[in-house]
Amino acid sequence: MPEFSLLAGHFGTLKKTIQGMPSDATLHSIMLKISQQFSSGIFYINMWPFSGTWMVVSTPSAASQIQKLNLTKPVILRRPLETVTGGPSMMSMHGETWKKWRALFNPGFNPGYIIGLAPNITDEVATFWLSCAKGQQGEVFPLESLTTRLTVDSICSVVLDTQLHHQIKDHPLATALQRQIDWTTFGTTFNPLKRYLTIRPLVLWYNNKVMDRIIGGEVDRACRTPPDHPSKSVISLALREYLQEQASTNSTRSLAEFKRLVAPQLRVFLFAGRNTTSSTLIYSYYLLAQHPEVLAKIRAEHEDVLGADPAEAQGRIKEDVQLLNKLPYTTAVIKETLRLFPPSASMREGRPDAEIIGEDGQRYPTVGCNVWTLTVALHHNSDYWDQVENFIPERWLVGPEDPLYPVKGAWRAFEFGPRSCIGQTLAMLELRIALAMTIRQFDITPAYDEWDSIHPATTAKEVNGHRAYQAERGAGGAHTADGFPCRVKERC
């Protein structure tokens, strides 16, 4: 446990750590720095006056124990999550209710099913490609403005079978969701105005009305789809599963009730997937630009599998989506990117009968604590990763005899077990397609030096040696600092 004050708790430790970091560094990054003081990989920290006591863990063993204890999400997460999603969703549900909804959507996110929707994603990436081509006219611009729109369009295309065209023009659904996120605090901000500003309820009410209207219309459209021409979208598959379940149990639940209950699930797919996939794509470009030898290898793999002409990649994928399963080095690049820059973590609520046993045999009670598996600390723990700070995609391709081989349970970008991220297959698919359709067409390089000359900083602007550090910008998400200012140049 960090040094404790009877008057201020651990606030002094937090303040001291924050002072040496950028003002918008994520709480994950702050806790990573604190966690490096504790070799056991488990410590307690009192978050007064913002929260209670947290147990922070960064070992595979402790993370696995937390997963198996089946702890619930704490109130400090459930409330803001349900504010964003408009009600209980798979992210905040527990027990039998969660099992029901997870079972309903599992078939739609099955790897064998989701890869069949790859052509939808290629169409959205083609629009992203055109946006990059426009951006390569010499100006420095924040790439996040494009990647977030790409992920929103891709998710809606796959889940709802609808094209928002948010990459071309602001769409009301995406705009309302962004406003909802911006006006929701996840307890990671220390700004009291952002926490307690009284106009918030009115803004949230309006956003909910907009999103419910649009999502309700899409569910109605799925209901009207002719049975002989069924849509392949995730929502259509879930609707068919729901109707079959109702018929088999003689239930009288109406479609109106399904529409009301399913809306938060659809919102959570957008909320959970938009920033995480967007930031991972950006960090892939960032790391590839820093490691030309890795960039050469991934481009060579794409040429071998998708053909010599990069412009034909989309057509090749549409003709044979299974080609995407023949890109092991690309997958390794993505997994290594997620190791160095995991976009999220996992927090649960402790209980009296739940203890975590450390690797030294010491018992750590969880009662009265929010138990946080700090993924970024686990991924940067040198006890479990050889050359921990180096970007080495090959570690995902070697055998168990190699020192680089990952320790079981040490990589938790999507968590493990029944409550692992349901959208991980979609995220990995979208990332493979985006890299396959862009990395040979463009050189995407960070332009922080130019950006900083125009926007001089008064505080530190690096975390762990990276100018492209993970930054806080609403809803506890880990964004790329300053939206990743870059230059895009089309390759000859």
From Swiss-Prot:
SUPFAM superfamilies: Cytochrome P450. InterPro entries: Cyt_P450 (IPR001128), Cyt_P450_E_grp-I (IPR002401), Cyt_P450_sf (IPR036396), Cytochrome_P450_monoxygenase (IPR050121). Keywords: Heme, Iron, Metal-binding, Monooxygenase, Oxidoreductase. Heme binds at C421. GO terms for biological process: aflatoxin biosynthetic process. Pathway: Mycotoxin biosynthesis; aflatoxin biosynthesis. Gene3D superfamilies: Cytochrome P450 (1.10.630.10). Cytochrome P450 monooxygenase; part of the gene cluster that mediates the biosynthesis of aflatoxins, a group of polyketide-derived furanocoumarins, and part of the most toxic and carcinogenic compounds among the known mycotoxins. The four major aflatoxins produced by A.parasiticus are aflatoxin B1 (AFB1), aflatoxin B2 (AFB2), aflatoxin G1 (AFG1) and aflatoxin G2 (AFG2). Within the aflatoxin pathway, with the versicolorin reductase aflM, the cytochrome P450 monooxygenase aflN is involved in conversion of VERA to demethylsterigmatocystin (DMST). Belongs to the cytochrome P450 family. This is Cytochrome P450 monooxygenase aflN.
